[in-house]
Amino acid sequence: MKFLFDLFPIILFFIAYKFGGIYQATIVAMVATIVQILWVYYRHRKIDAMQWVSLIMIMVFGSLTIFLHDSTFILLKPTALYWLFSGVLFVSAQFFNKNWIQVLMGKQITLKPTHAHTVWHQLNLAWSAFFFFMGFLNLYIAFEYSEETWVNFKLFGSTGLLIAFVIAQGFWMSRHIEHPAE
């Protein structure tokens, strides 16, 4: 359910684009993200860092798109977000010995202790590489295809690739998970 809730602004962006174009869709995405953040705060009295980053990104890139009447900015927003995530994962692991994937998932998953550090490191690198790739893919779709193709890719293509990556990661992780003794 959280996954669908996280898609709320993207789905509304897609629908608004189909009825009103890129500028109306951008405004709808900005408003939807604000509403989403307010709802999360109302329900949990807390907003996590990734939600703040997403809000700031949509407000900055969306505002530039609207005020300069140039859709290039909204086309670049996913790449900026993907590369920010990629960079944070990579730099924090390589230079600060902080594995954000382990921080986010470590309480839910217990790995076999013999090689847990290596597995978490590989998983962190895989996510960093995935986000880096997605940033380039977004640029390619945004500037080599029509705006409508990019909008379709933003909802269906990038979401589909994310789901496929999570499933593949799940299969890979299943070999390394410690199962409780029965």
Curated annotation (Swiss-Prot):
Family: Belongs to the YciB family.
UniProt protein name: Inner membrane-spanning protein YciB
Disulfide bonds, paired cysteine numbers: none
GO cellular component: plasma membrane
Function text: Plays a role in cell envelope biogenesis, maintenance of cell envelope integrity and membrane homeostasis.
Chief location: membrane
Annotated keywords: Cell inner membrane, Cell membrane, Membrane, Transmembrane, Transmembrane helix
Compartment(s) of residence: Cell inner membrane
Membrane topology per record: Multi-pass membrane protein
Pfam families on file: IspA (PF04279)
Record-annotated membrane-spanning stretches: 20-42, 55-75, 76-96, 123-143, 153-173
